[in-house]
Design a protein with these regions (language model features):
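Positively charged n-region of N-terminal signal peptides that target proteins for export
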Residues: 26-35
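Bacterial Sec signal peptide processing site at the extreme N-terminus
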Residues: 49-58
């Protein structure tokens, strides 16, 4: 009887310990799960806060908003700003505000706002999906990736179309090599041919498969920007050795600007047939969309662009 009772008591104690261990394991698992969920929420909240503003500088963001309101006041008729009634993320709205604040009035009246919103979303997608996206500083992305217009070309949906064709071609490359590869792709699409003074749109250049230097450089800048590579068109109105002009492209790579001949691929950047004339050029300039405060010498500031 004693042994039987003892065994029962021991069994009871063992059972209690087993239950205790199970309960403790469940409690620990619940604590770990809750801690994981809390950490996930905190990280997600931090990420949301980090992506909340397209323009992180409060002063500059306020200046852009004031310029946007002035543009709205100048165009009170019609539904020219109806795209802002759509549901969009806060960073998308700030980017759209930036574009509308400084784009020419003709671009507001001639094109539907959905075109600009689609371009913004494609730019943000490229920044996320391209391996160099996180390395592009905010101001460089704002002035040299986001803008749709390059020169005086007609605007089109080239950014979205070019991205789908180029994304897999450049994904495994460094930013430097991606610039070279995009220029090879541009050479496959467009060759140099003199044309009239009107600048064709990027898609029109692909359709005709030719263009003068101003059209080739407009096309190449659009292609580079489509995959999140900062790019700008550079223009000289007159060479030192001849009464002629030229336009080419500069691309931003890891903190430096490199030049390249548009649709004229070379094995490295900072190499082109115009190297010599460019070093002796009297004037080379580019028009940067919006109010730009970079290290370059500023030649002029207008309501829509900064000439450097």
């Amino acid at each position: 009887m004693h042994n039987s009772l003892t065994l029962k008591r021991q069994g009871y104690l063992l059972t209690n310990k087993y239950i205790h261990y199970i309960c403790a394991d469940k409690i620990n698992a619940m604590i770990k799960t809750n801690l994981f969920l809390l950490l996930f929420v905190l990280l997600a909240g931090t990420s949301c806060n980090r992506q909340q503003h397209f323009i992180s500088d409060d002063t500059f963001r306020a200046e852009v908003e004031n310029d946007f309101r002035a543009k709205q006041a100048a165009l009170p008729d019609g539904n020219l700003f109806s795209v802002f009634n759509q549901k969009m993320a806060s960073d998308e709205k700030e980017a759209l505000t930036f574009l509308y604040a400084y784009m020419p009035i003709g671009d507001i009246t001639d094109y539907d706002g959905q075109l600009y919103l689609d371009n913004i979303r494609s730019s943000f997608r490229a920044r996320v999906e391209m391996p160099w996206g996180d390395s592009i500083p905010e101001d460089i992305f704002r002035h040299f990736v986001l803008p749709v217009r390059v020169n005086n070309e007609n605007l089109d949906e080239s950014r979205m179309i070019f991205y789908e064709e180029l994304k897999d071609r450049v994904k495994g490359l460094s930013l430097y090599d991606a610039v070279l590869e995009v220029n090879h792709w541009c050479h496959e699409k467009v060759i140099y041919t003199p044309s009239d003074a009107r600048t064709s749109s990027p898609l029109a250049s692909v359709k005709t498969a030719y263009g003068r230097c101003g059209e080739e450089s407009t096309f190449t800048v659009a292609a580079l920007r489509s995959v999140g590579i900062p790019a700008r068109q550079v223009y000289t109105p007159r060479w030192a050795h001849t009464d002629d002009n030229h336009a080419w492209v500069e691309a931003w790579v890891n903190g430096k600007w490199y030049f390249l001949g548009a649709c004229e691929p070379e094995p490295v950047l900072n190499l082109g047939w115009f190297n010599g004339p460019a070093y002796r050029g009297m004037l080379m300039h580019t028009k940067v969309f919006g109010k730009y405060n970079g290290p370059e010498e500023v030649m002029d500031v207008t309501d829509g662009y900064t000439e450097i």
